[in-house]
């Protein structure tokens, strides 16, 4: 059975995560405040960010940068800036 939460990112009730996807206190906050749809949007941006900036997840500084971008995107409403990327026009 799915959980319904108020998603901080989408600013509406939505289906919550099935389990905690990220460790620690931040993971608990994501579990309680971020919907599956919002998390999927983040994963898409995260993939683009890792590829375009050539981030190495074995590098602690790169992981910290990615975590900061995640918090900014999910909780502060800031979009991820990827140099040279222009979003498609939605018709």
UniProtKB/Swiss-Prot annotation:
HAMAP family: Fe_traffic_YggX (MF_00686)
Protein name: Probable Fe(2+)-trafficking protein
Family: Belongs to the Fe(2+)-trafficking protein family.
Any matching Pfam family: Iron_traffic
Biological process terms in GO annotation: cellular response to oxidative stress
Record gene name: yggX
Job of this protein: Could be a mediator in iron transactions between iron acquisition and iron-requiring processes, such as synthesis and/or repair of Fe-S clusters in biosynthetic enzymes. Necessary to maintain high levels of aconitase under oxidative stress.
Keyword Repeat: no
Effect in UniProt of substituting residue 7 to S: Strong decrease in activity
GO MF annotations, alphabetized: iron ion binding
UniProt GO cellular component terms: cytosol
Record keywords: Iron
């Amino acid at each position: 059975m799915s959980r319904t939460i108020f998603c901080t990112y989408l600013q509406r009730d939505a289906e919550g995560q099935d389990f905690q996807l990220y460790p620690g206190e931040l993971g608990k906050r994501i579990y309680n405040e971020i919907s599956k749809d919002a998390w999927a949007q983040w994963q898409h941006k995260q993939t683009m960010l890792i590829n375009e900036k050539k981030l190495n997840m074995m590098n602690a500084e790169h992981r910290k940068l990615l975590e900061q971008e995640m918090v900014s995107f999910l909780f502060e409403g800031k979009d991820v800036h990827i140099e040279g990327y222009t979003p498609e026009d939605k018709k």
